Amino acid sequence: HKEYRRQRQMCIRDRLGVSDTAFASQGLAVHSPIDGGLIATVRETSPAEADAVITQAHAAFMEWRTVPAPRRGEFVRLLGEELRLHKETLGKLVTLEAGKILSEGLGEVQEMIDICDYAVGLSRQLFGLTIATERPNHRMMETWHPLGVCGVISAFNFPVAVWSWNAALALVCGNSVVWKPSEKTPLTALATLAIAERAAKRFGGIPKGLLSVLMGTHSIGAKLVENENVPLVSATGSTAMGRQVAPKLAARFARAILELGGNNAAIIAPSADTALALRAVAFAAIGTAGQRCTTLRRLIVHESLYEPFLTQLRKVYQSVRIGDPRLSDVLVGPLIDAQALTQMDKALAAARALGATITGGGRVTCEGLNGAYAAPALVEMPRQDGPALTETFAPILYVMRYHSLDEAIALQNGVGAGLSSSLFTLDMREAERFLAVDGSDCGIANINIGPSGAEIGGAFGGEKETGGGREAGSDAWKAYMRRATNTINYGTSLPLAQGVSFDLPTD
């Protein structure tokens, strides 16, 4: 086992450039969910070191903000190039550390590349506005300036992509970035920063501390939340985590981008292309072993289609291969750890107590792999209640019938989270109704595509207990900048707005 671990560490060091100083005999023990084996032990950041890192990041910001935005974009372009060069190696590490199937591990790195490409173009489009003014010989405009140190707290399920969504935009906007990754996936974070160092060398150097990482548990993440030199924190995690983070940021008037829980639904209407819907439902419900924030967790099927559609879906659930995510024919890998498997068991027991009929859902033994493997569960509920109302981070799909579209939309909106949603229909009126003000209440509403698989061109995030944050998309850059309104008087008089008169007495 020691030799196996040594070889893995050598791969991370030699192929991705992670320094030996990142590892330690005592610290964060990193286990692969694939086989439960210890990959490495990572040195933790002390509270004092965390404070010093943030101080250094603030100094880096003070320098970086004066670099022209297109030049900042050039660094991000080089970062994207380095990610392309190391896509396969980093993608395999995502699979090893997070348990995703290999195509999803590679796809996550592609997301990083995509957001870098997007941010490069954005670096020449940080537009302000010139605004009509009522005062003669005046000009009024809005300008945008870098904000400061941007903190990023990410979760295990997208161990590198979430950082890139924030970092690529924050960098072109003139900010520094301090990253606190999940304690379950620190190696991918270290590898990402090592790749960024390669880009920095090609760029000609960047300010020390412009990109940095904090290793540890929630107490180290709290340093980002509490530090006055961090004006923005993007936090991805559970709604419970958001309830802890948001008040602390609000208390010091810091900005928050909260990407929290999702209890996403899809509606299958009578006119749906059922072959397309079946594939979309399967991908959204069982991909990443149900551990996406956009995982499909509730399926609302019209009563006329319920039996034939569920018959086909049961066959899919019974045939999908579960096992080592590094194998090309495996579609469902492990849950992140045994605790996740326990939570899945509890949710299924609660559904069964309500009278649900369950297909799948049992624990799966994979030869030679000591991971937390489970069969995806198809749970036919008598009503939307109990565990169907909350998010369980596991491959559980609760299925319900509906009679009218109004009823289906009410079911879809009848939960605390409001991240992603979808409707499968060929009826234009139904589609437009779903997207209208009285349709889906989610931040993402799709037609004939599931709730998962967002692209960086669209704003990502949700409403209600999902937190209200947005990342990527057309105007996400504004979150990483501060806006100033400027009025210039180039005349010789001082006209006041709104016709106010304030004439000083004359001698």
Task: Describe each model-derived feature in a short phrase.
Residues H1-R8:
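Single conserved hydrophobic/aromatic residue that forms the stacking wall/gate
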Residues Q9-F23:
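Short, basic/aromatic recognition patches
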Residues D20-T45, E463:
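Active-site and channel-lining beta-strand-loop segments
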Residues D35-T41, G205, V230, I267, ...:
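Conserved C-terminal structural/oligomerization subdomain of aldehyde/semialdehyde dehydrogenase
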Residues G36, R72, V94, C116, ...:
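Residue-level signal for inorganic ion chemistry
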Residues I39-F127, N137:
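Glycine-rich loop-to-alpha-helix module at the N-terminal edge of alpha/beta enzyme cores
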Residues G128-L276, Y402:
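Rossmann-like NAD(P) dinucleotide-binding subdomain of oxidoreductase/dehydrogenase enzymes
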Residues R198, A240-R383, L405, A410, ...:
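ALDH superfamily catalytic-core signature
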